[in-house]
C-alpha cells in the first residue's frame, strides 16, 4: 500500500474546526454539570492536517472506543457520548472515580498501544481543568517523528506537515496490516491443523495412522504447521505492501518467499515433504488477501479475493508453458520418470533464471505430472480461483455441518466428496491416471 493513499478524505476548514471545538467544550460542561460523576474522559485522535477522518482513522477510533467502553467499566461509567463527524471523531465518558487513577490508567494506554501516540485521552475534574502528565510526575508525550518532547517540536515547528502525516500514515498502515496478517496466518494454520486432525482419511496422515506415508506421522505435520506460521503472515504482508505493483511482480515476491517457507518446512521435518502444495496455495491465497485488504475494510468481498487469486495463480502457468515448449524439443528417449522422488520445493520454478531440464531431479512432482499427462495441478487450481475448494469442498463441508455432523465427520465426508470429483495430482503421481480414476469412483460409493 502506498502511504500517500492512507490519509485521503474530505478536508475541513479552520472555521469548521473552531466550531467543532466549541461544541465539544459545551458538551464537556454539560456532562460535568450533570452532578452524577467525578471526572470526565475525552477521547479523540491526534491527526495533523485538514483531513481528519479517513478509513484507517475511523477504524482506529471505533477499535479503541470498544476497548475503552470495556476497560473504563472499572471506574463506573455514568454516561457516554459518541460523535463521529468530518472534523474528527470523539467520545466522552463520565466516570464516578477520582481523576488521578483514571489519568494514570489512560497514560498507560497512550504509552503501550501500537497507536497510542495518535490517541488523545484527556481527563477533566469537576472544575473542568485537565489533569496533566506533569501532575503525575510523568515525562511529556514524545514527538511522533523524532521521539523528542512533542510540545517543543510543535512550538518550534521542527517537522513539516508532510513528514508528520507520513509518520501518521505509517503507524496506521503498520497497525492494521500486522493485525490482519496475524488473522490470516492464524486462519491458515488452523486450516492445516483441522485437516491433519480430521480422522479417518483414506491413505492420508491422521490422528490414528500415517496412511500410505511411512516417513511421517501426525506430529510431523504439527512440526511443519508450526514452522509455516510466520510465512503465512509474510505472504499476506507481501500482498498488502506491494498492492500497487503488477501481479507478475507480486507473484515473483511470493515465489521467493514460498521457497524460503519450504526450506523452513524441510528443516522442521528433517527433509520430509508435508506441505509443499499447501505452501504454494497459501502463498497465492494469503497474498491475494493482503492485496485486496490493503484497499478495503472487512468483510472482504470473496469474489474479489478469488479474482486476485486467479490473477496471481495465472502467473505460474507461464512456467508450465515454458516447460511444455522445452519438452517438445527433447528426443523421445528423454522421458520423465514418474517414480523419482522430488526433494525440492513446490513453488513454481523460476524458469527465467533456471530453465527446465529433462532430468527428473530438476522437476517438481507437479511439473512431472504436467509433462506426462498435461494436468496443471495446483497451478491450474490457483489460476482458476481454487474451484475445487470453493465449488466442491466448502459446499460439502457446510452441507454436512448443517446436517448436524461434527466438524471432524463433516470434514472427512467433504474430503471424500473432493476425492470423488476433483483431480488429485498426488494420486496420479503415486499410481498413474487410471488408478486415480478408479480411486475417484471408489470414493463416490463410500
Model feature map: region roles:
Residues 2-69, 108-176:
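Long, contiguous binding/interaction regions
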Residues 91-108, 405:
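A contiguous pocket-lining binding segment that forms or flanks enzyme active sites
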Residues 120-123, 129-138, 144, 266-294, ...:
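Catalytic cofactor-binding cores of redox enzymes
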Residues 53-54, 99-106, 298-301:
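Short, conserved charged micro-motifs
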Residues 233-291:
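Long, hydrophobic/aromatic-enriched structural stretches that serve as scaffold segments
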Residues 40-98, 217, 221-243:
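Short, well-structured hydrophobic secondary-structure segments
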Residues 67, 71, 105-108, 112, ...:
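Generic non-transmembrane alpha-helical segments
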Residues 170-244, 251, 289-446:
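Phosphate-rich cofactor/ligand-interacting catalytic cores and adjacent structured alpha/beta frameworks
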Amino acid at each position: 500500500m502506498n502511504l500517500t493513499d492512507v490519509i485521503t478524505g474530505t478536508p475541513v476548514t479552520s472555521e469548521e474546526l473552531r466550531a467543532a471545538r466549541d461544541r465539544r467544550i459545551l458538551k464537556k460542561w454539560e456532562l460535568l454539570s450533570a452532578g452524577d460523576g467525578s471526572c470526565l474522559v475525552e477521547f479523540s485522535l491526534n491527526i495533523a492536517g485538514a483531513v481528519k477522518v479517513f478509513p484507517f482513522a475511523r477504524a482506529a477510533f471505533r477499535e479503541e472506543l470498544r476497548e475503552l467502553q470495556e476497560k473504563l467499566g472499572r471506574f463506573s461509567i455514568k454516561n457516554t457520548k459518541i460523535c463521529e463527524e468530518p472534523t474528527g471523531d470523539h467520545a466522552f465518558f463520565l466516570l464516578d472515580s477520582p481523576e488521578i487513577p483514571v489519568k494514570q490508567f489512560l497514560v498507560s494506554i497512550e504509552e503501550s498501544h501500537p497507536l497510542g501516540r495518535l490517541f488523545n485521552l484527556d481527563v477533566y475534574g469537576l472544575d473542568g481543568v485537565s489533569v496533566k502528565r506533569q501532575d503525575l510526575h510523568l515525562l511529556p508525550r514524545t514527538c511522533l517523528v523524532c521521539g523528542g518532547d512533542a510540545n517543543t517540536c510543535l512550538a518550534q515547528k521542527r517537522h513539516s506537515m508532510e513528514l508528520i502525516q507520513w509518520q501518521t500514515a505509517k503507524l496506521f498502515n503498520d497497525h492494521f496490516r500486522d493485525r490482519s496478517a496475524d488473522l490470516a496466518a492464524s486462519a491458515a494454520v488452523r486450516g492445516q491443523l483441522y485437516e491433519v486432525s480430521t480422522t479417518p482419511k483414506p491413505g492420508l496422515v491422521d490422528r490414528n495412522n500415517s496412511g500410505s506415508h511411512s516417513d511421517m506421522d501426525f506430529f510431523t505435520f504439527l512440526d511443519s504447521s508450526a514452522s509455516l506460521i510466520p510465512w503465512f503472515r509474510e505472504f499476506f504482508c507481501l500482498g498488502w505492501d506491494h498492492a500497487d505493483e503488477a501481479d507478475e511482480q507480486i507473484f515473483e515476491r511470493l515465489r521467493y518467499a514460498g521457497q524460503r517457507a519450504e526450506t523452513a518446512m524441510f528443516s522442521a521435518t528433517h527433509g520430509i515433504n508435508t506441505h509443499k502444495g499447501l505452501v504454494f496455495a497459501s502463498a497465492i491465497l494469503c497474498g491475494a488477501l493482503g492485496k485486496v485488504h490493503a484497499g478495503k475494510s472487512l468483510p472482504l468481498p470473496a469474489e474479489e479475493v478469488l479474482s486476485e487469486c486467479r490473477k496471481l495463480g495465472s502467473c505460474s502457468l507461464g512456467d508450465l508453458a515454458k516447460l511444455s515448449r522445452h519438452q517438445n524439443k527433447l528426443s523421445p528417449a528423454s522421458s520423465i520418470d514418474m517414480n523419482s522422488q522430488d526433494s525440492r520445493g513446490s513453488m513454481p520454478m523460476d524458469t527465467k533464471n533456471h530453465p527446465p531440464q529433462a532430468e527428473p531431479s530438476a522437476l517438481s512432482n507437479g511439473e512431472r505430472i504436467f509433462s506426462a499427462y498435461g494436468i496443471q495441478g495446483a497451478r491450474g487450481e490457483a489460476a482458476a480461483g481454487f474451484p475445487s475448494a470453493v465449488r466442491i469442498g466448502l459446499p460439502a463441508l457446510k452441507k454436512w455441518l448443517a446436517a448436524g455432523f461434527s466438524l471432524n465427520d463433516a470434514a472427512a465426508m467433504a474430503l471424500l466428496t473432493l476425492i470423488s470429483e476433483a483431480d488429485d495430482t498426488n494420486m496420479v503421481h503415486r499410481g498413474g491416471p487410471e488408478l486415480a480414476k478408479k480411486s475417484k469412483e471408489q470414493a463416490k460409493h463410500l
